Amino acid sequence: MSDWESHTVIGQKARAGGSGPRANVARTQGQINAARRQGLVLSVDKKYGTANTKGDAEGQRLTKVDRETDIVKPKKLDANVGKTIARVRTEKKMSQKDLATKINEKPTVINDYEAGRAIPNQQVLGKMERALGVKLRGKAIGEPLGGPKKK
């Protein structure tokens, strides 16, 4: 058990005048069990080291989905997006493996996107857009990707 997982306070709740046993923190399961046998365990609390961590928004979304009563199918990729990916890829004389290597994904991911089986991932779609040079999101699917905006 790591130091950050939990700490147990052993001793009296209030020490008036410094008398009585000192409250201390048990670090091992053996120390906790020994204190429980003596009846000295006051609390077992979790310690969380959250100084540099961020909450996961995906976990919040999954909790919301879990609490809903109706069953919702995950969104699938539109069929014309898959056809556009396949068409542009063949125009550029790239195989699925070449495209997958270019965007650092597995060839099965490209296959799923082209077949329309994939659950849309904005990061993967963005990488495909840049690699193929066409839009795959929004209303203008299949149109050439514009360069950076002029200032």
Swiss-Prot record:
Homology family: Belongs to the MBF1 family.
Role noted for this protein: Transcriptional coactivator that stimulates GCN4-dependent transcriptional activity by bridging the DNA-binding region of GCN4 and TBP (SPT15), thereby recruiting TBP to GCN4-bound promoters. Involved in induction of the ribosome quality control (RQC) pathway; a pathway that degrades nascent peptide chains during problematic translation. Required to prevent stalled ribosomes from frameshifting.
Gene3D superfamilies according to UniProt: lambda repressor-like DNA-binding domains (1.10.260.40)
One GO-annotated biological process of the protein: rescue of stalled ribosome
Annotation: DNA-binding region: 96-115
The UniProt record lists the keyword Isomerase: no
GO terms assigned for molecular function: DNA binding; ribosome binding
Matching CDD domains: HTH_XRE
InterPro entries named among the record's database cross-references: Cro/C1-type_HTH, Lambda_DNA-bd_dom_sf, MBF1_N
PANTHER family: ENDOTHELIAL DIFFERENTIATION-RELATED FACTOR 1 (PTHR10245:SF15), ENDOTHELIAL DIFFERENTIATION-RELATED FACTOR 1 MULTIPROTEIN BRIDGING FACTOR 1 (PTHR10245)
Region entry Disordered, spans: 1-31
Protein name (Swiss-Prot/TrEMBL): Multiprotein-bridging factor 1
